[in-house]
């Protein structure tokens, strides 16, 4: 079979099903990535969300015996919000990162990959394939880099010449020996804007990320957020775009190619106070379609509390007192107490002290004491 012709046929077909960029790579082991992952593991830079088996992350043969090549795909997503609602005193709003706008991208990319699989099976009935998006074993970034989708930027994102880094990535391992594409040369040069601006210093050096410091990771954790990071969250409800928005390669990049990726402004820039008491049913109905809902509502509610503290939003004090007193989840009770201490105001200290009288959880009591300390500092 003429595999070069088949490759061209696949490229042509990909354009008809809404794939913005496609590349082909060999399925040989990712030896350089393996060394980086071992180092990351030794330095404790991993988030815990990734596949723990480094061999599986770097050897496609373990995932599909007889693998010959990997097809990488990229879909561009919007970077600008049309008709964005204003955040103002009394009506403060949070923000979801761009990668969580619209329908869950895992579903969108899986749809494209399934169509690609069906096309290839029709051409080659005996073909073997294994597709994955984000949560699969392989590193999307390493595959895309090898397949010429883009280069791996210092912000730890794949940067494409056509769409910047505002792209979702997915891949398909196959036993078909497609001719590989050439990687794109690194075009970051001496620029360090992303490293310099990272709020928590998570970008240790070019292409190296301490995931446990990354705000995108921190917003997804479920426990108490370490106090050193709370002020740095700002009004972020889920994820962080800072290292992308500052990137010169993203200037002017805003693509609205896929209707299912179009964001609802009220969802991706939501009012903060209503989030504090949203029911499970309402949360699933409103936010269930978004990738940002995958960890459930508690982390987002905790982040909404931190955002209200960031704004020092006095109008939210009654709601925060209600959460501190009555919410069954210790993380939210304690975070609300801390936030009340940050905001301050008449009656706040008394409310915290009264709540302490019946609070049994040690971590919550610690946060309540911390809230009182913050109030005392305001009086000094």
UniProtKB/Swiss-Prot annotation:
TM annotation in the entry: none
The reaction(s) this protein catalyses: epoxyqueuosine(34) in tRNA + AH2 = queuosine(34) in tRNA + A + H2O
SUPFAM superfamilies: 4Fe-4S ferredoxins, ARM repeat
Residues making up the signal peptide according to the UniProt record: none
Pfam name, any one: Fer4_16
Annotated GO biological process: queuosine biosynthetic process; tRNA modification
Superkingdom of origin organism: Bacteria
Record text on cofactor binding: Binds 2 [4Fe-4S] clusters per monomer.
Enzyme Commission number, as recorded: 1.17.99.6
Annotated residues for binding of [4Fe-4S] cluster 2: 198, 214, 240, 243
Domain (4Fe-4S ferredoxin-type) ranges: 178-208, 226-258
GO cellular component: cytoplasm
Gene3D superfamilies: 3.30.70.20, Leucine-rich Repeat Variant
GO molecular function, one term: 4 iron, 4 sulfur cluster binding
Cofactor(s) the protein needs: cob(II)alamin; [4Fe-4S] cluster
Family that this chain belongs to: Belongs to the QueG family.
HAMAP family documented for this protein: QueG (MF_00916)
Function: Catalyzes the conversion of epoxyqueuosine (oQ) to queuosine (Q), which is a hypermodified base found in the wobble positions of tRNA(Asp), tRNA(Asn), tRNA(His) and tRNA(Tyr).
Subunit composition and interactions: Monomer.
PANTHER family: EPOXYQUEUOSINE REDUCTASE
Protein name (database record): Epoxyqueuosine reductase
């Amino acid at each position: 079979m003429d595999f070069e012709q088949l490759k061209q046929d696949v490229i042509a077909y990909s354009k008809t099903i809404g794939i913005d960029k496609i590349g082909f790579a060999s399925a040989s082991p990712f030896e350089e990535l393996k060394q980086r992952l071992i180092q990351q593991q030794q330095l404790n830079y991993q988030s815990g969300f990734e596949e723990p088996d480094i061999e599986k992350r770097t050897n496609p043969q373990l995932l599909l015996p007889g693998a010959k090549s990997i097809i990488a795909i990229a879909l561009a997503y919007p970077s600008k919000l049309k008709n964005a609602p204003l955040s103002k005193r009394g009506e403060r709003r949070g923000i979801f990162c761009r990668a969580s706008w619209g329908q869950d991208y895992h579903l969108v990319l899986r749809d494209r990959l399934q169509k690609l699989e069906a096309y290839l099976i029709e051409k080659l009935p005996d073909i073997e394939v294994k597709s994955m998006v984000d949560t699969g074993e392989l590193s999307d970034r390493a595959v895309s880099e090898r397949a010429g989708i883009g280069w791996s930027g210092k912000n730890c994102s794949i940067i494409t010449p056509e769409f910047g880094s505002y792209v979702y990535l997915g891949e398909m391992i196959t036993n078909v020996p497609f001719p590989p594409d050439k990687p794109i040369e690194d075009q970051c040069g001496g620029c360090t804007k992303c490293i310099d601006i990272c709020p928590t210093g998570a970008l240790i050096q070019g292409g190296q990320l301490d995931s446990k410091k990354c705000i995108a990771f921190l917003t997804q954790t479920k426990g108490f957020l370490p106090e050193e990071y709370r002020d740095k969250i700002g009004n972020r409800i889920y994820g962080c775009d800072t290292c992308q928005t500052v990137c010169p390669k993203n200037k002017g990049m805003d693509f609205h190619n896929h209707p299912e990726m179009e964001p609802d402004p009220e969802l991706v820039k939501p009012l903060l106070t209503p989030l504090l008491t949203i029911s499970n049913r309402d949360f699933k109905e409103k936010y269930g379609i978004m990738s940002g809902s995958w960890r459930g509502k508690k982390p987002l509610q905790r982040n909404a509390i931190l955002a209200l503290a960031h704004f020092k939003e006095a109008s939210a004090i009654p709601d925060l007192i209600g959460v501190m007193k009555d919410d069954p989840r210790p993380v939210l009770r304690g975070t609300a107490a801390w936030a009340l201490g940050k905001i301050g105001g008449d009656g706040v200290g008394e409310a915290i002290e009264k709540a302490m009288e019946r609070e049994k959880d040690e971590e919550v009591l610690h946060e309540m004491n911390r809230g009182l300390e913050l109030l005392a500092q305001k009086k000094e």
